[in-house]
């Protein structure tokens, strides 16, 4: 049986899922929170976070070694302001970082080093931004999210150019060693098969140079990379030591005879058969002619034994003279390198031939010249440079991930070694690269998720912090070397600015620190779970090819194949799948059920993409019997990225859930399995743009993910502990905690404050509404209050609309949507938008700006909504152009004419020294002022309104704290009373004692006396805490604000704008079916059914077939059934049918269909619970149809039948205007529709007289500039085609850039003279000037 929480009991979703729920959906924000926790948490091993950064930089030694600064530990202080205060004040929510440092000064006496002095001190090292409980940061008052980055994992990668580089189409292989920190090292073949290396993508050098720099000589190089052929000189012949398989594929250049028998004739190709014969005969040497030796390459240096002169150096081709000389010098054995064209190419040998260097020093010098061109190389400089490139821990680090990937790639057993490279590493990489070129081994797939890892917030912040510390390190080193250390303390060494600057830069302007998308809870959660391939150290849009963006088999269960933006970022920005998480190395992993002896168990194992490749994995929708064994013998499984059929005994793992492969956004689309992928992508993206409506309504057809999203997003209020609701109003909920959940020394009261009408990042409204009632019992984890777009703890992005699929007079042409006036009247899609408008008063050169109600040249009417301080009242309804905050700016002294001087002298008018620069309501905005905030600089006198606001805030704070204290005191007194009663005291006696005296009562039982004493201490502590809180709050409210330089005062006005739905607004369903409202039709004109019920929305049926999103039709049918069942329950309630009948009917609906997952026995519910359930079911029984495991067609039909509706889902409709029946039944049902944040009010505007461009004098474009409509060249052609010469002339002159003409025309209109006189357009003058700038003079002749 399914166990429901008390919130779920209020409204159960009928679940059509067939597969059992093996694994609960993990906390959806864990990727953000865990990563940041790792960063700030103290790590004793020093592998992660701040500790790792400090340990990697400290101790800092002076250049002469006389002193060093050591790191001991760090601690993060408490943030001064809480999240809400930081948002209103425009501050960063952060805590101070204090680090304990030790300065040690040494005394160098002869050889011994003794400690002269030790000083310890705690040093302030800047502020570290903190993450809020919802995984965001408050930076300068705005909520931001740091998106995780998918970047190429450190390690070694073998790749090829796929034959694209060289014209011949030859495939060139390369290897690249990528460290976490340090220089990249590349090895590559050129078209002539020589091997080269590059450092940091600079000029390439032959690979032998790096080998010589590693102290290898030519002999050692050949010895390392080649096998040897050994030839023995006898008196009259040459014998070759035979290794039979090396002859394969060669053409014999001589007869191969053994015991006078010829086995292989000259010119014959040596095959495997010949080699087997040679092996069988156990022949170890064969006789070869001298010619066979000519052209072979010597593997060693051979010297003249008498003169010690070199006869032949290693890597030299042998010729007849060299062979003779070797014989003369009595060499019996000669070694040559073994190469062939098949699988042992002579690459290194040929590369040595083009290498200009001859020893280690010349190789180092060559590397130095390549890295630092133009600088004269010295031996020491060259050695240091090479040493620091790859072998110094300060400059180079593969990291534990890089080392693991590196050693795995080279098949080394040990995966933990140092982070720097060594000789054997470089040799191993070159060997593997040569093997790949020789046809052994495969290249890596760089888009495989085993080669790409996720870098989350914590790691990026740590890297940034380390950069700041490195800057500090340089300064400290210089400071330590200056002497006079006796007077200095660690504090004097450290300047926190570079660290703060690095952190600030990252959180403020990094490409991955983004302004949070806060349209609705889903967009918040998706933004935090986003994974981007862009950003520092990642890809750029321009360079990213098709392969990187494409869906890869390893994305399965890790990255969503559906949710990604349309446009230039497609495939580069992805979303994490529902169950995916990162492992300790940063690779994405996904859970699977383990299979033991052919039976699927509930044991869960997380596998990364690398591990997954070795297993055969069955899909989640595979049929199992009761014991967990597979029903079929052959099952579709995935193995190494391919799907095929496998025997059931071969399978190792099985998927956990059908929604494992998709992201949170896509898992909210019901019947996703019936939608085309492109439309599903649009659907997932558009859900994030839905604006929270005035009253949220749960979807009738959901997927069961709605609750998880709403709860995890943090917009709802969740009970921390169970208990009874003691008090509830619109802004506060108080819960008396259950006894078994109370700690012994506390009052047992939980207070929850609700957010009321605050503004989101996207200007939508955030408002929390309690969804529990007084005296209700709540459990831990229950939803206490709904936030924006949530309904009883479920995500509710839109509204359930009664839709009909039919054409209606062309009003739904091209995806347009026809809606009924009823939708507007019922405020179904009315949304509240909150705009923040700020007025800043600055100190200017001419004097300071002033906020006042005394504004020059403004009538009384315009000032009617302002108070005496010049600031608008709260509650005032304002229109476009109204003054919100009166402000005057000093004007520069202008030269006055004598007449003006005279007037000034007579009337004494001085007010014209200032100009009006008031804050006005933007054009086209109509709203109500809901809040005003005033921030005044320290030392500037506060105006009357500011003092009023301050007083009000203090009153409110005091009231809140007093109420809070009262509640806690009540809790304590209740505990004391129960203790005294338990000790044997009479209740009547107790009631006579005043509360304040209760603590003084003495009881005989020592245990109870101790408990009372403890409670008394708690009471005293509570009082102290209350006074302290009050004092802190008072200080925060009364102190001046920290404003930017030159700013005296900031007034912020918040306007609430109510937007009804209107033609031009964009709406969409959840299946990528979007459209614009074309007309709002009167209710009486809408099509209606035989009961007279009109439809709300008419959609075009032609929008379905070509788009292939059939999910919307199935949703409509299921929605109809759901609503039909709701209507039946509603009728039963109205007819006051017995609760038994209602229980039976709801049970019947729940039992319908093959829903093994949801077995609900309503007999366990009380009558009250059934009644509450039925009331919530009046508008339809909510249904959940999980993705890839949803309702079948037969189940939908059965549900329609139960609701007494036609099983086709089609109904006869009548035309609202004529009353005539439409000629065929129409698909009618309920679809969940969203209103998207693309409102016509934000897009449409009309220009009167506005601003003009400076050079061309043409009107500007765009709403922000109050611009006009562009009349482009195509429009000009159109008028030319019609021969409308005068209209064209008007467009190109007076309506555009004929300055005199347009002024004249304005005057003429005022005078009532409707004539126009076109003049010379300004753009023509610009053209003249441009031609003159080419030294061609053009003069205009006057007629």
From Swiss-Prot:
It holds the Pfam family RNA_pol_Rpb2_3. This is DNA-directed RNA polymerase subunit beta. Keywords: DNA-directed RNA polymerase, Nucleotidyltransferase, Transcription, Transferase. The keyword Membrane does not apply. Its EC number is 2.7.7.6. It comes from the Bacteria. InterPro entries: DNA-dir_RNA_pol_bsu_ext_1_sf (IPR042107), DNA-dir_RNA_pol_bsu_external_1 (IPR019462), DNA-dir_RNA_pol_su2 (IPR015712), DNA-dir_RNAP_su2_dom (IPR007120), DNA-dir_RNAP_su2_hyb_sf (IPR037033), RNA_pol_bsu_bac (IPR010243), RNA_pol_bsu_CS (IPR007121), RNA_pol_bsu_protrusion (IPR007644). The RNAP catalytic core consists of 2 alpha, 1 beta, 1 beta' and 1 omega subunit. When a sigma factor is associated with the core the holoenzyme is formed, which can initiate transcription. It catalyses: RNA(n) + a ribonucleoside 5'-triphosphate = RNA(n+1) + diphosphate. GO terms for molecular function: DNA binding; DNA-directed RNA polymerase activity; ribonucleoside binding. DNA-dependent RNA polymerase catalyzes the transcription of DNA into RNA using the four ribonucleoside triphosphates as substrates. One of its GO terms (cellular component) is DNA-directed RNA polymerase complex. GO terms for biological process: DNA-templated transcription. It is an enzyme of class 2 (transferase). Belongs to the RNA polymerase beta chain family. PANTHER family: DNA-DIRECTED RNA POLYMERASE I SUBUNIT 2.
């Amino acid at each position: 049986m399914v166990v429901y929480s008390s919130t779920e009991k209020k409204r159960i979703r009928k679940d059509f899922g067939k597969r059992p729920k093996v694994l609960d959906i993990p906390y959806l924000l864990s990727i953000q929170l865990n990563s940041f926790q790792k960063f700030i948490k103290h790590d004793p091993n020093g592998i992660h976070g701040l500790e790792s950064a400090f340990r990697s930089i400290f101790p800092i030694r002076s250049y002469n070694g006389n002193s060093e600064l050591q790191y001991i530990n760090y601690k993060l202080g408490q943030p001064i302001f809480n999240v809400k205060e930081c948002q209103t004040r425009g501050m960063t929510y952060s805590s101070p970082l204090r680090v304990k440092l030790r300065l040690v000064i040494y005394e160098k006496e002869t050889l011994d080093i003794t400690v002269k002095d030790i000083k310890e001190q705690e040093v302030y090292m800047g502020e570290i931004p903190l993450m809020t409980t919802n995984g965001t940061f408050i930076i300068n008052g705005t909520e931001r999210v740091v998106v995780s980055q998918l970047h190429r994992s450190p390690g070694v990668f073998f790749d090829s150019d796929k034959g694209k580089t060289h014209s011949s189409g030859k495939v060139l292989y390369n290897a690249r060693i990528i460290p976490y920190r340090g220089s990249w090292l590349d090895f590559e073949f050129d078209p002539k098969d020589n091997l080269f290396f590059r450092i940091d993508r600079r000029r390439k050098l032959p690979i032998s140079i790096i080998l010589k720099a590693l102290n290898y000589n030519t002999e050692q190089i050949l010895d390392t990379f080649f096998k040897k052929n050994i030839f023995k000189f006898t008196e009259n012949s040459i014998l070759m030591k035979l290794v039979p398989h090396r002859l394969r594929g060669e053409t014999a250049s001589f007869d191969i005879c053994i015991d006078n028998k010829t086995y292989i004739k000259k010119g014959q190709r040596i095959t495997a058969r010949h080699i087997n014969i040679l092996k069988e005969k156990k022949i170890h040497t064969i006789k070869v002619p001298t010619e066979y030796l000519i052209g072979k390459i010597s593997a060693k240096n051979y010297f003249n034994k008498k003169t010690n002169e070199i006869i032949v150096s290693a890597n030299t081709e042998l010729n007849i003279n060299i062979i003779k000389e070797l014989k003369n010098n009595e060499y019996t054995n000669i070694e040559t390198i073994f190469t062939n064209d098949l699988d042992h190419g002579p690459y290194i040998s040929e590369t040595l031939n083009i290498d200009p260097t001859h020893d280690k020093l010349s190789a180092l010098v060559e590397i130095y010249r390549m890295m630092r061109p133009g600088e004269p190389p010295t031996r020491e400089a060259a050695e240091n440079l090479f040493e620091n490139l790859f072998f110094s821990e300060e400059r180079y680090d593969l990291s534990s991930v890089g080392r693991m990937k590196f050693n795995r790639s080279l098949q080394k057993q040990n995966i933990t070694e140092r982070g720097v490279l060594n000789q054997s590493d470089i040799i191993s990489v070159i060997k593997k690269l040569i093997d790949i070129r020789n046809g052994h081994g495969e290249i890596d797939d760089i888009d495989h998720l085993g080669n790409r890892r996720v870098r989350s917030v914590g790691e990026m912040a740590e890297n940034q912090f380390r950069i700041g510390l490195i800057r500090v390190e340089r300064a400290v080193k210089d400071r330590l070397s200056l002497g006079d250390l006796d007077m200095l303390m660690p504090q004097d060494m450290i300047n926190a600015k570079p660290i703060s600057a690095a952190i600030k830069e990252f959180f403020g302007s990094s490409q991955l620190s983004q302004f949070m998308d806060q349209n609705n809870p889903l967009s918040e959660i998706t933004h935090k779970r986003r994974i981007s391939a862009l950003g520092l150290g990642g890809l750029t849009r321009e360079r990213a090819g098709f392969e990187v963006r494409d869906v890869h088999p390893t994305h399965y269960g890790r990255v969503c194949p559906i949710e990604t933006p349309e446009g230039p970022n497609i495939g580069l920005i992805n979303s994490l799948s529902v169950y995916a998480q990162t492992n300790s190395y940063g690779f994405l992993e996904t859970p699977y059920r383990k299979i033991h002896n052919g039976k699927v168990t509930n044991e869960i194992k997380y596998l990364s993409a690398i591990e997954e490749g070795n297993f055969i994995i069955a899909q989640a929708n595979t049929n199992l019997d009761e014991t967990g064994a597979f029903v079929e013998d052959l099952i579709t499984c995935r193995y190494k990225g391919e799907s095929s059929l496998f025997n059931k005994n071969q399978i190792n793992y099985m998927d956990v859930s059908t929604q494992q492969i998709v992201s949170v956004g896509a898992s909210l689309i019901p019947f996703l399995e019936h939608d085309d992928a492109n439309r599903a992508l649009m659907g997932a993206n558009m859900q994030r743009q839905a604006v929270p409506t005035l009253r949220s309504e749960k979807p009738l057809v959901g997927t069961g993910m709605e609750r998880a999203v709403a709860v995890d997003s943090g917009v709802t209020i969740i009970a921390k502990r169970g208990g009874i609701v003691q008090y509830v109003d619109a802004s506060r909920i108080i819960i008396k905690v259950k006894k078994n959940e109370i700690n012994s020394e506390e009052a047992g009261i939980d207070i929850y404050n609700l957010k009321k009408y605050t503004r989101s990042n996207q200007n939508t409204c955030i408002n929390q509404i309690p969804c529990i009632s007084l005296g209700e019992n709540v459990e831990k984890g229950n939803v206490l209050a709904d936030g924006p777009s949530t309904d009883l703890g479920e995500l509710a992005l839109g509204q359930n609309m009664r839709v009909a699929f039919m054409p209606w007079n062309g009003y739904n042409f091209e995806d347009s949507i026809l809606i009924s006036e009823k939708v507007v009247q019922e405020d179904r899609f009315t949304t509240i938008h909150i705009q923040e408008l700020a007025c800043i008063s600055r100190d200017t050169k001419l004097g300071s700006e002033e906020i006042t109600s005394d504004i020059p040249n403004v009538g009384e009417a315009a000032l009617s909504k302002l108070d005496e301080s010049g600031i608008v009242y709260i509650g005032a309804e304002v229109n476009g152009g109204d003054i919100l905050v009166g402000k005057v700016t000093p004007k520069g002294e202008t030269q006055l004419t004598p007449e003006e001087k005279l007037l000034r002298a007579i009337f004494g008018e001085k007010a014209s020294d200032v100009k009006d620069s008031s804050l006005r309501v933007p054009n086209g905005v109509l709203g109500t002022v809901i809040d005003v905030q005033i921030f005044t600089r320290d030392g500037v006198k506060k105006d009357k309104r500011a003092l009023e606001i301050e007083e009000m805030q203090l009153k409110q704070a005091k009231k809140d704290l007093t109420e809070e204290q009262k509640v806690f005191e009540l809790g304590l007194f209740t505990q004391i009373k129960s203790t005294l009663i338990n000790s044997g005291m009479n209740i009547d006696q107790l009631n006579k004692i005043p509360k304040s005296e209760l603590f003084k009562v003495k009881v005989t039982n020592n245990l109870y006396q101790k408990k009372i004493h403890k409670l008394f201490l708690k009471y005293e502590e509570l009082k102290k805490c209350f006074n302290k809180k009050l004092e802190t709050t008072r200080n925060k409210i009364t102190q001046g604000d920290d404003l930017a330089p030159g700013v005296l005062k900031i007034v912020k006005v918040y306007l609430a704008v109510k937007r009804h739905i209107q033609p031009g607004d964009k709406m969409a369903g959840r299946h990528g079916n979007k459209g614009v409202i074309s007309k709002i039709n009167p209710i009486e004109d809408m099509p209606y059914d035989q009961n007279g019920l009109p439809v709300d929305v008419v959609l075009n049926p032609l929008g379905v077939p070509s788009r292939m999103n059939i999910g919307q039709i199935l949703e409509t049918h299921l929605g109809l059934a759901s609503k039909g069942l709701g209507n039946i329950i509603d009728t039963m309630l109205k007819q006051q049918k017995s609760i038994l009948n209602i229980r039976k009917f709801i049970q019947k609906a729940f039992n319908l269909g093959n829903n093994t997952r949801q077995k609900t026995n309503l007999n366990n519910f009380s009558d009250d619970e059934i009644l509450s359930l039925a009331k919530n079911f009046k508008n339809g029984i909510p249904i959940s149809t999980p993705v890839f495991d949803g309702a079948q067609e037969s189940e939908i039909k059965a549900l329609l039948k139960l609701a007494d509706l036609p099983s086709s889902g089609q109904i006869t409709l009548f035309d609202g205007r004529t009353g005539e029946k439409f000629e065929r039944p129409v698909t009618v049902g309920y679809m969940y529709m969203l209103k998207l944040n693309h409102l016509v009010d934000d897009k449409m505007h009309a220009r009167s007289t506005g601003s003009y461009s400076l050079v061309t004098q043409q009107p500007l474009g765009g709403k922000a500039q109050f611009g006009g409509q562009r009349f482009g060249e195509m429009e000009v052609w159109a008028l030319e085609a019609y021969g409308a010469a005068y209209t064209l002339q008007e467009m190109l002159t007076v309506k555009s850039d004929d300055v005199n003409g347009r002024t004249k025309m304005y005057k003429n209109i005022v005078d009532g003279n409707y004539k126009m006189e076109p003049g010379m357009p300004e753009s023509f003058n610009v053209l003249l000037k441009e031609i003159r700038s080419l030294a061609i003079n053009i003069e205009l002749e006057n007629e």
